[in-house]
Amino acid sequence: MNKYLAEAFGTFWLVLGGCGSAVLAAGFPDVGIGLLGVALAFGLTVLTMAFAIGHISGCHLNPAVTVGLWAGGRFDTKDVAPYIIAQVIGGLIAGGILYVIATGQAGFDVVGSGFAANGYGEHSPGQYSMLAALVSEIVMTMMFLIVIMGATDKRAPQGFAPIAIGLCLTLIHLISIPVTNTSVNPARSTAVAMYVGDWAVSQLWLFWVAPIVGGVLGAVIYKNLLGKESND
């Protein structure tokens, strides 16, 4: 049970820290943290939680990571569904707290602001198409899993995995925030989409399908190509 609670708490922190920075701080007058700050915030949530709960649950915080690690032979089948449920619950609680905080500002419009929801077409920050969003999310999540698999490989330098994984997530956000607002995490997308409703819910399917496909691809590529012992 501890590992499921850890995943819920960890995903809670990822959503509150990452989406919270986007909603509350990104465009704050004069001292807003901007795109770079939001990207760094997401990376820092994973970095801090990896040290806090990595030894308890592995610090997945993401259904695409859980399914990817399972596909890569690094995770037990019986824990896949409970992990995903815990991640979604933790994210939704964080989304609710963020909603309460954000709507405490006079005139705040959840739907109009986007509430850090992920989207494509007219709801993409840069007006990118559904195809562009699909490709971006698949490729970014694929690379995320390759980094996770490599950084946690027993042959990798020990103790540096949280840093590599956190920085990778920061880089992913720097690349793809303009395209989809960056998901690579179905729990993160669900956590805010449920409070926006409307278009965010109707487009949510892409932010489940693409990250999971990308996660499986990345894990399988690492397991079968990059992760094999070399005879050279």
UniProtKB/Swiss-Prot annotation:
Domain of life: Bacteria
MF terms in GO: water channel activity
Protein's cellular compartments: Cell inner membrane
Site (Involved in tetramerization or stability of the tetramer): 19
Cell membrane among keywords: yes
Keyword annotations: Cell inner membrane, Cell membrane, Membrane, Repeat, Transmembrane, Transmembrane helix, Transport
Record has Cell inner membrane as a keyword: yes
Subunit description: Homotetramer.
Position of sequence motif NPA 1: 62-64
Family, similarity comment: Belongs to the MIP/aquaporin (TC 1.A.8) family.
Annotated protein name in UniProt: Aquaporin Z
Membrane spanning residue stretches: 8-28, 33-53, 84-104, 130-150, 159-179, 201-221
Function: Channel that permits osmotically driven movement of water in both directions. It is involved in the osmoregulation and in the maintenance of cell turgor during volume expansion in rapidly growing cells. It mediates rapid entry or exit of water in response to abrupt changes in osmolarity.
Site (Selectivity filter): 42, 173, 182, 188
NPA 2, short sequence motif: residues: 185-187
Membrane topology: Multi-pass membrane protein
InterPro entries: Aquaporin-like, Aquaporin_transptr, Aquaporin_Z, MIP, MIP_CS
GO cellular component, one term: plasma membrane
Organism from which the protein derives: Vibrio parahaemolyticus serotype O3:K6 (strain RIMD 2210633)
Catalyzed reaction equations: H2O(in) = H2O(out)
Database matches in Gene3D superfamilies: Glycerol uptake facilitator protein (1.20.1080.10)
Record note on domains: Aquaporins contain two tandem repeats each containing three membrane-spanning domains and a pore-forming loop with the signature motif Asn-Pro-Ala (NPA).
SUPFAM superfamilies linked to this entry: Aquaporin-like
